[in-house]
Amino acid sequence: MKKAGKFFTVLFISLVMLSFLSCGKKSSEYFKLWNDCDSLKALIEYVEDVTDKKSPNYIPVEDRIVTFDMDGTFIGELYPSYFEYNILEYRVLDDPDYKDRASESELFAANAIRDFVRSGKPLPDHFDMIHARAAAKAYAGMTIPEFDAYVKNFAKRTPNGFEGMTYAESFYKPMLEVFDYLTANNFTFYVVSGSDRFICRALVDSLGIEPNRVIGMDVLLKSDNQGDDEGVNYTYKTTDRLLRTDVLLIKNLKTNKVKNIAQEIGKVPVLSFGNSGGDSAMHNYCLANTKYKSRAFMLIADDDEDDHANREKALKLGQQWKEAGYVVISMRDDFKTIYGENVKKVDFKF
Protein backbone atom coordinates (compact mmCIF):
# COMPACT_ATOMS: atom_id res chain seq x y z
CA MET A 1 0.00 0.00 0.00
CA LYS A 2 2.83 2.37 0.87
CA LYS A 3 4.49 1.72 -2.50
CA ALA A 4 1.20 2.32 -4.27
CA GLY A 5 0.73 5.55 -2.34
CA LYS A 6 4.18 6.76 -3.32
CA PHE A 7 3.47 5.84 -6.93
CA PHE A 8 0.28 7.87 -7.05
CA THR A 9 1.97 10.78 -5.28
CA VAL A 10 4.75 10.84 -7.87
CA LEU A 11 2.19 10.48 -10.65
CA PHE A 12 0.14 13.37 -9.27
CA ILE A 13 3.19 15.64 -9.00
CA SER A 14 4.24 14.72 -12.53
CA LEU A 15 0.78 15.51 -13.90
CA VAL A 16 0.74 18.86 -12.10
CA MET A 17 4.15 19.76 -13.50
CA LEU A 18 3.05 18.67 -16.96
CA SER A 19 -0.07 20.83 -16.70
CA PHE A 20 2.05 23.84 -15.79
CA LEU A 21 4.34 23.23 -18.72
CA SER A 22 1.43 22.81 -21.10
CA CYS A 23 -0.03 26.11 -19.91
CA GLY A 24 3.12 28.02 -20.84
CA LYS A 25 2.49 30.37 -23.73
CA LYS A 26 4.44 30.33 -26.92
CA SER A 27 6.01 33.68 -27.68
CA SER A 28 3.68 34.38 -30.59
CA GLU A 29 0.61 33.83 -28.40
CA TYR A 30 1.29 37.05 -26.51
CA PHE A 31 0.82 39.16 -29.61
CA LYS A 32 -2.81 39.12 -30.71
CA LEU A 33 -2.70 42.73 -31.90
CA TRP A 34 0.41 42.45 -34.07
CA ASN A 35 0.71 41.48 -37.69
CA ASP A 36 3.33 39.00 -38.86
CA CYS A 37 6.20 41.47 -39.25
CA ASP A 38 9.97 41.80 -39.08
CA SER A 39 10.00 43.95 -35.95
CA LEU A 40 8.01 41.41 -33.93
CA LYS A 41 10.17 38.57 -35.22
CA ALA A 42 13.27 40.51 -34.18
CA LEU A 43 11.90 40.99 -30.66
CA ILE A 44 10.83 37.36 -30.22
CA GLU A 45 14.09 35.99 -31.62
CA TYR A 46 16.06 38.24 -29.30
CA VAL A 47 14.08 37.33 -26.18
CA GLU A 48 14.13 33.60 -26.91
CA ASP A 49 17.88 33.75 -27.48
CA VAL A 50 18.86 35.67 -24.35
CA THR A 51 16.53 33.69 -22.06
CA ASP A 52 17.84 30.32 -23.25
CA LYS A 53 20.36 29.05 -20.70
CA LYS A 54 22.07 27.04 -23.42
CA SER A 55 22.65 30.13 -25.55
CA PRO A 56 26.00 31.94 -25.45
CA ASN A 57 23.90 35.13 -25.32
CA TYR A 58 22.02 34.14 -22.16
CA ILE A 59 21.29 37.07 -19.83
CA PRO A 60 20.67 36.41 -16.12
CA VAL A 61 17.29 37.57 -14.85
CA GLU A 62 18.77 40.34 -12.72
CA ASP A 63 20.34 41.98 -15.79
CA ARG A 64 17.31 41.87 -18.09
CA ILE A 65 16.77 45.62 -17.98
CA VAL A 66 14.51 47.37 -20.50
CA THR A 67 13.89 51.11 -20.97
CA PHE A 68 10.77 52.57 -22.57
CA ASP A 69 10.12 56.13 -23.59
CA MET A 70 6.47 57.03 -22.92
CA ASP A 71 4.89 59.61 -25.27
CA GLY A 72 4.63 58.19 -28.76
CA THR A 73 6.14 54.88 -27.65
CA PHE A 74 3.29 53.34 -25.70
CA ILE A 75 0.88 56.24 -25.17
CA GLY A 76 -0.54 58.77 -27.62
CA GLU A 77 1.13 62.06 -28.44
CA LEU A 78 -0.85 63.25 -31.46
CA TYR A 79 -3.99 64.56 -29.74
CA PRO A 80 -2.91 67.05 -30.98
CA SER A 81 0.35 67.20 -29.01
CA TYR A 82 1.99 65.63 -25.96
CA PHE A 83 -0.21 65.11 -22.91
CA GLU A 84 2.03 67.37 -20.83
CA TYR A 85 1.74 70.14 -23.43
CA ASN A 86 -2.05 69.80 -23.49
CA ILE A 87 -2.41 69.90 -19.72
CA LEU A 88 -0.12 72.95 -19.43
CA GLU A 89 -2.13 74.76 -22.10
CA TYR A 90 -5.28 74.05 -20.09
CA ARG A 91 -3.71 74.96 -16.74
CA VAL A 92 -2.42 78.34 -17.89
CA LEU A 93 -5.10 79.46 -20.34
CA ASP A 94 -8.33 77.77 -19.26
CA ASP A 95 -8.20 76.56 -15.65
CA PRO A 96 -10.49 78.99 -13.78
CA ASP A 97 -8.61 78.33 -10.54
CA TYR A 98 -5.22 79.25 -11.99
CA LYS A 99 -5.28 81.18 -15.29
CA ASP A 100 -5.42 84.61 -13.65
CA ARG A 101 -2.27 83.83 -11.66
CA ALA A 102 -0.11 82.62 -14.54
CA SER A 103 3.20 84.39 -15.12
CA GLU A 104 4.36 85.86 -18.43
CA SER A 105 6.69 82.94 -19.12
CA GLU A 106 3.87 80.47 -18.52
CA LEU A 107 1.56 82.43 -20.81
CA PHE A 108 4.26 82.54 -23.48
CA ALA A 109 4.70 78.76 -23.38
CA ALA A 110 0.98 77.97 -23.27
CA ASN A 111 0.16 80.33 -26.13
CA ALA A 112 3.02 78.87 -28.18
CA ILE A 113 1.45 75.42 -27.73
CA ARG A 114 -1.99 76.74 -28.66
CA ASP A 115 -0.67 78.48 -31.79
CA PHE A 116 1.23 75.33 -32.77
CA VAL A 117 -1.70 72.93 -32.49
CA ARG A 118 -4.33 75.28 -33.91
CA SER A 119 -2.53 77.02 -36.75
CA GLY A 120 0.67 75.04 -37.20
CA LYS A 121 2.89 77.93 -36.16
CA PRO A 122 6.34 76.45 -35.37
CA LEU A 123 7.28 76.24 -31.72
CA PRO A 124 10.15 78.51 -30.63
CA ASP A 125 13.67 77.11 -30.65
CA HIS A 126 14.54 75.01 -27.60
CA PHE A 127 10.89 74.82 -26.66
CA ASP A 128 11.41 71.67 -24.62
CA MET A 129 13.25 73.78 -22.04
CA ILE A 130 10.84 76.72 -22.35
CA HIS A 131 7.97 74.35 -21.62
CA ALA A 132 9.81 72.62 -18.78
CA ARG A 133 10.49 75.88 -16.95
CA ALA A 134 6.92 77.05 -17.46
CA ALA A 135 5.54 73.73 -16.21
CA ALA A 136 7.71 73.95 -13.11
CA LYS A 137 6.06 77.28 -12.30
CA ALA A 138 2.53 76.23 -13.23
CA TYR A 139 2.28 73.45 -10.66
CA ALA A 140 4.46 74.96 -7.93
CA GLY A 141 2.92 74.75 -4.47
CA MET A 142 1.02 71.53 -5.13
CA THR A 143 1.62 68.53 -2.89
CA ILE A 144 2.46 65.22 -4.58
CA PRO A 145 -1.06 63.80 -4.00
CA GLU A 146 -2.67 67.04 -5.21
CA PHE A 147 -0.67 67.01 -8.43
CA ASP A 148 -1.38 63.31 -8.98
CA ALA A 149 -5.11 63.98 -8.59
CA TYR A 150 -4.92 67.00 -10.93
CA VAL A 151 -3.25 64.95 -13.67
CA LYS A 152 -5.63 62.01 -13.29
CA ASN A 153 -8.65 64.30 -13.33
CA PHE A 154 -7.49 65.97 -16.56
CA ALA A 155 -6.76 62.52 -18.01
CA LYS A 156 -10.46 61.64 -17.70
CA ARG A 157 -11.14 63.94 -20.66
CA THR A 158 -11.60 62.73 -24.20
CA PRO A 159 -8.50 63.74 -26.16
CA ASN A 160 -9.00 66.15 -29.03
CA GLY A 161 -9.19 64.30 -32.34
CA PHE A 162 -10.57 61.01 -31.03
CA GLU A 163 -13.77 59.33 -29.90
CA GLY A 164 -14.09 56.27 -27.69
CA MET A 165 -11.27 56.81 -25.20
CA THR A 166 -9.93 59.16 -22.56
CA TYR A 167 -6.36 60.35 -22.18
CA ALA A 168 -6.04 57.79 -19.39
CA GLU A 169 -6.95 55.02 -21.85
CA SER A 170 -4.84 56.19 -24.78
CA PHE A 171 -2.27 53.42 -24.64
CA TYR A 172 -0.95 51.71 -27.74
CA LYS A 173 -2.58 48.33 -27.16
CA PRO A 174 0.07 46.32 -29.07
CA MET A 175 2.80 47.82 -26.89
CA LEU A 176 0.99 46.69 -23.75
CA GLU A 177 1.39 43.17 -25.14
CA VAL A 178 5.13 43.82 -25.26
CA PHE A 179 5.02 44.71 -21.55
CA ASP A 180 3.25 41.43 -20.78
CA TYR A 181 5.65 39.41 -22.91
CA LEU A 182 8.75 40.90 -21.34
CA THR A 183 7.34 40.51 -17.83
CA ALA A 184 6.56 36.84 -18.52
CA ASN A 185 10.20 36.40 -19.54
CA ASN A 186 11.51 38.02 -16.36
CA PHE A 187 12.59 41.34 -17.82
CA THR A 188 12.28 44.45 -15.65
CA PHE A 189 11.22 47.52 -17.59
CA TYR A 190 11.48 51.18 -16.70
CA VAL A 191 9.66 54.20 -18.12
CA VAL A 192 12.29 56.79 -19.08
CA SER A 193 10.42 59.82 -20.39
CA GLY A 194 11.00 63.46 -21.18
CA SER A 195 7.68 64.24 -19.50
CA ASP A 196 7.37 65.19 -15.84
CA ARG A 197 8.12 62.19 -13.63
CA PHE A 198 4.91 62.67 -11.64
CA ILE A 199 2.78 63.04 -14.77
CA CYS A 200 4.23 59.76 -16.00
CA ARG A 201 3.55 58.06 -12.67
CA ALA A 202 -0.07 59.19 -12.76
CA LEU A 203 -0.61 57.98 -16.33
CA VAL A 204 0.98 54.54 -15.93
CA ASP A 205 -0.51 53.86 -12.51
CA SER A 206 -3.41 51.97 -14.13
CA LEU A 207 -0.91 49.61 -15.76
CA GLY A 208 0.51 48.58 -12.41
CA ILE A 209 3.93 50.07 -13.12
CA GLU A 210 5.52 50.90 -9.78
CA PRO A 211 6.52 54.55 -9.20
CA ASN A 212 10.15 53.55 -8.61
CA ARG A 213 10.31 52.33 -12.22
CA VAL A 214 9.43 55.74 -13.64
CA ILE A 215 12.08 58.32 -14.57
CA GLY A 216 11.26 61.72 -16.04
CA MET A 217 11.65 65.47 -15.85
CA ASP A 218 12.15 66.60 -12.26
CA VAL A 219 11.51 69.75 -10.25
CA LEU A 220 12.84 70.48 -6.80
CA LEU A 221 10.65 69.26 -3.93
CA LYS A 222 10.68 70.85 -0.50
CA SER A 223 8.77 70.74 2.77
CA ASP A 224 6.00 73.26 3.28
CA ASN A 225 7.69 74.40 6.51
CA GLN A 226 11.23 74.45 5.17
CA GLY A 227 11.28 78.10 4.17
CA ASP A 228 14.59 79.18 2.63
CA ASP A 229 16.60 76.48 4.41
CA GLU A 230 18.52 74.01 2.29
CA GLY A 231 17.32 70.43 2.61
CA VAL A 232 20.60 69.45 4.24
CA ASN A 233 19.88 71.94 7.04
CA TYR A 234 16.21 71.12 7.62
CA THR A 235 14.68 68.11 9.37
CA TYR A 236 11.39 66.95 7.91
CA LYS A 237 8.63 66.69 10.55
CA THR A 238 5.74 64.26 10.77
CA THR A 239 3.32 67.11 10.10
CA ASP A 240 5.19 68.40 7.03
CA ARG A 241 4.08 67.98 3.43
CA LEU A 242 6.25 67.80 0.32
CA LEU A 243 5.54 70.51 -2.22
CA ARG A 244 6.53 70.99 -5.84
CA THR A 245 8.61 74.12 -6.39
CA ASP A 246 9.24 76.19 -9.50
CA VAL A 247 12.88 75.08 -9.68
CA LEU A 248 13.57 72.82 -12.66
CA LEU A 249 16.19 70.18 -11.87
CA ILE A 250 16.44 68.28 -15.15
CA LYS A 251 14.69 67.84 -18.48
CA ASN A 252 15.02 64.14 -19.14
CA LEU A 253 15.92 64.11 -22.83
CA LYS A 254 18.82 62.81 -24.92
CA THR A 255 21.99 62.32 -22.84
CA ASN A 256 20.11 63.29 -19.69
CA LYS A 257 18.22 60.02 -20.15
CA VAL A 258 21.50 58.13 -20.15
CA LYS A 259 22.65 60.02 -17.06
CA ASN A 260 19.46 59.19 -15.19
CA ILE A 261 19.53 55.54 -16.23
CA ALA A 262 23.08 55.24 -14.90
CA GLN A 263 22.19 57.01 -11.66
CA GLU A 264 18.79 55.51 -10.91
CA ILE A 265 18.90 52.03 -12.45
CA GLY A 266 22.62 51.42 -12.18
CA LYS A 267 22.74 48.94 -15.07
CA VAL A 268 23.01 49.32 -18.82
CA PRO A 269 19.76 48.27 -20.54
CA VAL A 270 19.68 45.32 -22.91
CA LEU A 271 16.50 46.46 -24.65
CA SER A 272 15.32 50.00 -25.39
CA PHE A 273 12.13 51.33 -26.98
CA GLY A 274 11.48 54.86 -28.21
CA ASN A 275 10.08 56.94 -31.06
CA SER A 276 12.13 60.11 -31.51
CA GLY A 277 15.56 61.69 -31.59
CA GLY A 278 15.18 62.37 -27.88
CA ASP A 279 15.50 58.61 -27.39
CA SER A 280 18.56 58.04 -29.59
CA ALA A 281 21.05 58.60 -26.77
CA MET A 282 19.23 56.04 -24.61
CA HIS A 283 19.21 53.59 -27.52
CA ASN A 284 22.90 54.08 -28.22
CA TYR A 285 23.69 53.53 -24.54
CA CYS A 286 21.80 50.25 -24.76
CA LEU A 287 23.50 49.16 -27.98
CA ALA A 288 26.90 50.00 -26.49
CA ASN A 289 26.32 47.38 -23.77
CA THR A 290 29.62 45.50 -23.71
CA LYS A 291 28.40 42.72 -21.45
CA TYR A 292 25.26 41.48 -23.19
CA LYS A 293 23.61 41.27 -26.57
CA SER A 294 21.23 44.23 -26.94
CA ARG A 295 18.54 45.63 -29.23
CA ALA A 296 16.86 49.02 -29.71
CA PHE A 297 13.43 49.59 -31.27
CA MET A 298 11.94 52.79 -32.72
CA LEU A 299 8.24 53.28 -33.42
CA ILE A 300 7.27 55.45 -36.37
CA ALA A 301 3.87 57.17 -36.46
CA ASP A 302 3.09 56.30 -40.09
CA ASP A 303 -0.60 55.39 -39.68
CA ASP A 304 -2.53 58.43 -40.89
CA GLU A 305 -5.83 56.54 -40.99
CA ASP A 306 -6.11 55.66 -37.29
CA ASP A 307 -3.94 58.46 -35.87
CA HIS A 308 -3.13 62.07 -36.70
CA ALA A 309 0.18 61.08 -38.23
CA ASN A 310 2.44 62.68 -40.82
CA ARG A 311 3.22 59.58 -42.86
CA GLU A 312 5.81 61.20 -45.12
CA LYS A 313 7.78 62.51 -42.15
CA ALA A 314 7.50 59.16 -40.36
CA LEU A 315 8.88 57.20 -43.30
CA LYS A 316 11.90 59.50 -43.54
CA LEU A 317 12.52 58.99 -39.83
CA GLY A 318 12.15 55.25 -40.27
CA GLN A 319 14.99 55.21 -42.77
CA GLN A 320 17.09 57.33 -40.43
CA TRP A 321 16.48 54.91 -37.54
CA LYS A 322 17.38 51.88 -39.66
CA GLU A 323 20.66 53.51 -40.63
CA ALA A 324 21.34 54.15 -36.93
CA GLY A 325 21.00 50.42 -36.21
CA TYR A 326 17.54 50.45 -34.63
CA VAL A 327 14.71 48.03 -35.40
CA VAL A 328 11.78 50.04 -36.79
CA ILE A 329 8.20 49.34 -35.70
CA SER A 330 5.63 50.62 -38.20
CA MET A 331 2.40 51.56 -36.45
CA ARG A 332 0.54 51.17 -39.75
CA ASP A 333 2.03 47.91 -40.99
CA ASP A 334 2.94 46.11 -37.77
CA PHE A 335 -0.09 46.90 -35.56
CA LYS A 336 -3.59 45.51 -36.12
CA THR A 337 -4.91 48.41 -34.06
CA ILE A 338 -3.41 51.31 -32.13
CA TYR A 339 -5.85 52.34 -29.41
CA GLY A 340 -8.42 49.56 -29.87
CA GLU A 341 -11.18 48.83 -32.34
CA ASN A 342 -13.72 51.04 -30.54
CA VAL A 343 -11.57 54.17 -30.83
CA LYS A 344 -12.19 56.44 -33.79
CA LYS A 345 -10.04 59.21 -35.21
CA VAL A 346 -12.04 62.41 -35.82
CA ASP A 347 -11.25 65.96 -36.87
CA PHE A 348 -9.71 68.29 -34.31
CA LYS A 349 -12.10 70.79 -32.72
CA PHE A 350 -10.82 74.08 -31.31
State where each predicted segment sits.
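C-terminal cap/substrate-recognition subdomain and adjoining C-terminal extension
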Residues: K25-W34, D38, I44, E48, ...
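Bacterial N-terminal signal peptides that target proteins for export
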Residues: M1-L11
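Bacterial N-terminal signal peptides
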Residues: V10-S19
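A metal-dependent, Asp-based hydrolase signature
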Residues: Y79-Y82, I87-A168, K173
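Short, function-defining helix-loop hinge/capping sites that tune catalysis or transport
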Residues: E77, S81-E84, Q226, H283
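Non-catalytic pre-domain segments flanking phosphatase-related domains
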Residues: F8, L21-M70, L78, V92, ...
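Generic anion/oxyanion-binding catalytic loop in active/binding sites
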Residues: F12, K32, A136
